[in-house]
Design a protein with these regions (language model features):
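Residues at the C-termini of beta-strands that transition into short coil/loop
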Residues: 87, 112, 131
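Compact, glycine/acidic-enriched structural inserts
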Residues: 117-133
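Segments surrounding the PLD/"HKD" phosphodiesterase catalytic module and close analogs
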Residues: 53, 94-122
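A surface-exposed partner-binding patch
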Residues: 1-100, 138-139
């Protein structure tokens, strides 16, 4: 397991977050095929270690990292087919995810809306750190 992922998982386990077991590379690649999108390596490292949180659980700042199954569910419900979410704040107050046509990590405030134009982070690893440190940019 990648060191940064190991540190994040350890932190969440200490906090009592209910974490799913990791997924397989095959499942990630199948999702990439369905979404017509290639996830970055840091995202893959994370999901190989944990497939999001269980039972809508969230970490201390109320962010819920989705299992792969929920990523596709939310994508199918969203009107913005350029946005691929992977977590939400306070049970869908807003979403954090990728854009298919732009590098970085973005926010979207409603599944009936479009993601913001400006990225809040450059990498998945960076945004996980921002979420865990409660950066103002994630709200």
């Amino acid at each position: 397991m990648n060191k940064w992922v190991q540190n994040v998982v350890s932190k969440w386990k200490t906090e009592g977050v209910k974490i799913n077991n990791g997924t397989s590379l095959g499942d990630i690649e199948a999702l990439e095929s369905v979404l017509d999108f290639k996830f970055p390596d840091d995202f893959k490292d994370f999901y190989l270690a944990i497939d999001g949180f269980k039972d809508l659980d969230w970490q201390e700042h109320m962010f819920y990292f989705w299992p792969l199954e929920k990523i596709i569910e939310e994508f199918n419900e969203s009107l913005d087919k350029n946005f691929i979410g992977f977590c939400d704040f306070l049970l869908a107050s807003h979403y954090i995810g990728f854009k298919k046509n732009q590098t970085g990590i973005f926010k979207m405030y409603s599944i009936s809306d479009r993601a913001e134009d400006n990225s809040i982070a450059q990498t998945f690893e960076e945004v996980v750190g921002m979420i865990n440190s409660r950066s103002d940019l994630i709200y």
